[in-house]
């Protein structure tokens, strides 16, 4: 849980913005969304594998694009 100490004479808006930024960096909102509903372990593994395949394909496409551009 991110903790923010409000500085002296610091406006509330600025402190709230710092808190939101620290929550974003800690990944709290994405974690809450991910845990909102139960996901079976098999479904979780399937989703993780699909995202890994997608990342791999994107990496290959980027490398091919670099090779075709550099001449």
UniProtKB/Swiss-Prot annotation:
PANTHER family xref list: MITOCHONDRIAL 28S RIBOSOMAL PROTEIN S21, SMALL RIBOSOMAL SUBUNIT PROTEIN BS21
InterPro entries assigned: Ribosomal_bS21, Ribosomal_bS21_CS, Ribosomal_bS21_sf
Lineage, opening ranks: Bacteria, Pseudomonadati, Pseudomonadota, Gammaproteobacteria, Enterobacterales
Coiled-coil regions, chain positions: none
Pfam families listed in its UniProt record: Ribosomal_S21
Gene3D superfamilies: Ribosomal protein S8 (1.20.5.1150)
Family: Belongs to the bacterial ribosomal protein bS21 family.
One GO CC term, this protein: ribonucleoprotein complex
Ribonucleoprotein among keywords: yes
Gene name of the record: rpsU
Protein name: Small ribosomal subunit protein bS21
Taxonomy, superkingdom: Bacteria
Organism: Blochmanniella floridana
UniProt key word Ribonucleoprotein: yes
One GO MF term attached to the UniProt entry: structural constituent of ribosome
